[in-house]
Amino acid sequence: MILRSAPWASGVSASASSRKITLKEVPGTSFKVIFLDEADALTPDAQGALRRIMEQHSQTCRFILSCNYSSKIIEAIQSRCAVFRFRPLAEDQVDEMIRSVASSEDITLEDEAAEAIVHVSLGDLRKAITALQVAASLSSTVTRDLIYETTATAPPEELHGYLLACKEDGFQPARRRLKGLLDKYGLAGTDMVNQLHRGLGEVAFLDEKQKLAVTEAMAETDYRMVEGGGEALQLDAMTATICSLIGK
C-alpha cells in the first residue's frame, strides 16, 4: 500500500493520532511501504520526529518522501535516503499526455489550447492535467483563452502589450493596461512580475541592454513586495521605472 499524506502543520504525532491507519504488505516483499507527499511542508521538529520513526521501523518499513524543495528536508533524513531528482518533462511529452487524456475523456481540445497548457505547466504534468480538468469542467470545448483565464496566467501577447505601452504610450496608459491584466486574470503582484520576467526574453522590440535594465526593475519590485511593500504602489513604481528606462 502507498500512503499519501496531507501537508502537516502541527507535526507527525498530531497527524498520526487523528486516525488509525492499517498498512498491508506489498506483494512480493517482506516490508511495508509508506509514501509521504509534500514532505517539505513538515516543520523541522516534525521531520526530526519522522526520522526517529524511520529508524525504529527500518526493518519492516520503507519510507518514500516526495518534495518540491530538497533543501527543506533536514540533513538527518537526507543522509538516510537515496535521493532521486526528476527534471521537468519536455514540452512534447506534456503535449502528448494532455492530448491523450482529452481523447480518453471525450474533451475537444483545440491545438492552441494544448499549446497554452504546455506554456503554463512549465513541464509539470500534474499542473497540466489540472489545467485541462478545470477548463473542461466549464466547457466541453477547451480553448486557449479558457486555459489562460482558469490558470490565472496572462497570455504572452498581453504581457508584451504592457511593455509596448511602457515604451510608446507612457505611464498612465501602461498603468491602466497593467491593472486591466491584474483584474482580468486574477493575478497577484508577484505573479505578474514573474510572468513578465519569464516572457521578457521573447520581446523583440527591446534590445539586450533594455532587457537587463527592466529585469533589475522587476527584481527590485518583487523583493519589495515579498518584504511587505504595498502591491499597488510597488507595481506603479515598477511601471514608472520601466517607462523611464525604455520610453521614448
Predicted regions and their residues:
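Short glycine-/polar-rich loops that comprise or flank the Walker A/P-loop
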Residues: 30-31, 58-61, 78-82, 123, ...
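Conserved catalytic/switch belt of AAA+ P-loop NTPases
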Residues: 18-26, 36, 40-79
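Conserved AAA+ ATPase "SRH/arginine-finger" region at the nucleotide-binding site
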Residues: 68, 82-95
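Helix-rich C-terminal "collar"/helical-bundle subdomain used as an assembly and partner-interaction module
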Residues: 161-248
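Residue-level signature of catalytic and energy-coupling elements of molecular machines
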Residues: 15, 50, 66, 81, ...
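C-terminal helical "lid" of AAA+/P-loop NTPase domains
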Residues: 114-120, 126-140, 148, 163-164, ...
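Short glycine-rich substrate-engagement loop in P-loop NTPases that contacts/grips substrate
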Residues: 1-32
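Short conserved motifs of the RecA-like P-loop NTPase core
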Residues: 31, 95-97, 108-120, 142-148, ...
